[in-house]
Design a protein with these regions (language model features):
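N-terminal cap/lid segment of alpha/beta-hydrolase-fold proteins
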Residues: 27-58
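Short, surface-exposed "cap/lid" segments of acyl-processing enzymes
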Residues: 47-50, 56-107, 111-114
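Alpha/beta-hydrolase active-site loop
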Residues: 119-148
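Gly/Ala-rich beta-loop-alpha elbow adjacent to hydrolase catalytic centers
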Residues: 157-162, 166
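C-terminal catalytic histidine-bearing segment of alpha/beta-hydrolase fold enzymes
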Residues: 239-273
Length: 273
């Protein structure tokens, strides 16, 4: 039997590990991580959403690394969406603050902004998480971050569902010199099939943009023990590209969807162009 739009992810996979953390606490955690590493908050108003961002302290440089957050706390239980998708563990922010180069962090719509239900209906962290207006807004924010930091080229780094966003944004741009994903959900159709979940009917899917992505060098880091976004999702994405495409995947032993990307990130960063 086909399941509903289940909460696949941190809480969907391990409900016992989801200790209560209210939204103000989640916001405070991210701000503490950012402040500790001298990242400054710079929220961005786009046509459709107000997006939370943090900009690193490095000197302005030609290349900006933009880290895009995952789906966050999208589900309260396996079948019930949360009231606010602000992450309980901001993995992409943990990675961004470890980057010694010019870096910025960009949250997803409705994360960290305490938005109303009118501004942020639940569909934007469930079925429509990769909707055209979401990608439009993220792309607009990336352009503004690029201007704020004086960059002329971009490396987009997406964690989990942020990997899909990074790919879809990269497909719309000509200034992305590398696409990087960490435990990235690069094919949500394959992902929902694997988990026997309802499709993300309002969302764009990265493989459909392969022609725009084929010329961009790509590196995808995958946890061998990741049961949330297993390697099969990457393989489904990769097969739409020609063999000659500059796409590299590294499958890391003893790593799952969450653990232990921050510990490994300084070493993995050295592999990037």
């Amino acid at each position: 039997m086909r399941l509903g739009l289940i909460g696949i992810g941190l809480c969907g996979a391990a409900l016992a590990g989801c200790a209560t953390m209210e939204v103000p606490q989640r916001v405070a955690l991210a701000e503490h991580i950012a402040t500790e590493h001298r990242f400054s908050r710079a929220d961005i108003q786009t046509e459709h959403f107000r997006l939370a961002a943090f900009i690193g302290p490095r000197e302005k440089a030609g290349v900006l690394h933009v880290y895009i957050e995952g789906d966050g706390f999208a589900w309260a239980t396996r079948y019930k969406p949360s009231r606010d998708p602000t992450p309980r563990e901001p993995v992409a922010l943990d990675l961004a603050v470890l980057d010694s180069r010019n870096a910025a962090y960009l949250a997803r719509p409705c994360q960290y902004v305490m938005a109303s239900e009118v501004e942020c209906p639940v569909r934007y962290w469930t079925s429509d998480r990769f909707a055209p207006e979401v990608i439009d807004s993220m792309n607009e924010a990336v352009t503004l971050l690029k201007g704020k930091t004086g960059a002329d080229r971009l490396v987009l780094v997406g964690y989990s569902g942020g990997g899909a966003v990074a790919a879809l944004v990269a497909a719309r741009r000509t200034d992305v010199i590398q696409l990087v994903t960490v435990a990235g959900n690069l094919d949500h159709r394959a992902w929902t099939r694997l988990h026997q979940a309802s499709e993300l009917t309002g969302s764009l899917n990265p493989p459909d943009s392969w022609r725009a992505l084929v010329g961009i060098p790509q590196t995808h880091f995958i946890g061998q023990d990741d049961t949330v976004v297993p390697v099969e999702v990457y393989r489904s994405y990769r097969k739409v590209f020609p063999e000659s495409a500059d796409i590299r995947a590294e499958i890391l032993p003893n790593v799952d969807h969450r653990c232990c990307w921050a510990d490994m990130w300084p070493t993995l960063l050295m592999q990037l162009r």
